[in-house]
Each structure stands twice: as C-alpha cells, then as structure tokens.
C-alpha cells in the first residue's frame, strides 16, 4: 500500500536507487497504490552515470509491497521492502534489467516486458 511521501526501492538498472511517491494516479482522490498500479515518483537517490538523475520525475509501476497482494485461493504474497520500476512516457521500463522477484499480477499486456525481464515471477 503506497501513498504520497512513501519511499520505494528501484528494482531496475535505470540509475535510480530510491524514489519517493509524489502522486497516486487513477482518480482525483485516490489514496493508495498496490502492486501493478502506476504512480508518479521523484528520484531521491541515484548512482553516478545512470539514466535517472536525482530530482527527476518519472512514472513508475509498483512491483513489490510490504502489504502484499491477496490471491483468489486465499494466499497472500508479501515482500520485505516496497519496490517500483521506472517507466518512460510509453509505459515501457527505462532499465534493461529487473532485480528481484515480481508477482503474477503484473501479467497484463501493459507490463509483460517487466515480467519477461524479471528473474523470478511469484
């Protein structure tokens, strides 16, 4: 469950390390974002010579949350940290690699590229 001011790890090699949510997209008063939702983020920490620089604003898709996601069979998938993947204007990932597992809930037409790059799909 991500809201404004939440900080997330970046799960791709775009150059950003930590980002902060500045807006949850999808409705005028939408408060929370979960796995698979798109948010606007500001880069708070970046590596030198990366594509993303500190202070840049990007769209991002949430790929892991501490809150987790409930499956139809009743099971819950939770993670230790919140994480997101930075997206360009076409909602394609900026990085060419994805770090860590992602959930099966990302398997929509929009995010199949992220699922195919991920080392593990839970």
Curated annotation (Swiss-Prot):
This is Large ribosomal subunit protein uL14. InterPro entries: Ribosomal_uL14, Ribosomal_uL14_bac-type, Ribosomal_uL14_CS, Ribosomal_uL14_sf. Keywords: Ribonucleoprotein, Ribosomal protein, RNA-binding, rRNA-binding. GO terms for cellular component: cytosolic large ribosomal subunit. NCBIfam families: rplN_bact. It comes from the Bacteria. Part of the 50S ribosomal subunit. Forms a cluster with proteins L3 and L19. In the 70S ribosome, L14 and L19 interact and together make contacts with the 16S rRNA in bridges B5 and B8. Binds to 23S rRNA. Forms part of two intersubunit bridges in the 70S ribosome. It holds the Pfam family Ribosomal_L14. Belongs to the universal ribosomal protein uL14 family. Gene3D superfamilies: Ribosomal protein L14. The gene is rplN. GO terms for biological process: translation. One of its GO terms (molecular function) is large ribosomal subunit rRNA binding. PROSITE patterns: RIBOSOMAL_L14 (PS00049). SMART domains: Ribosomal_L14.
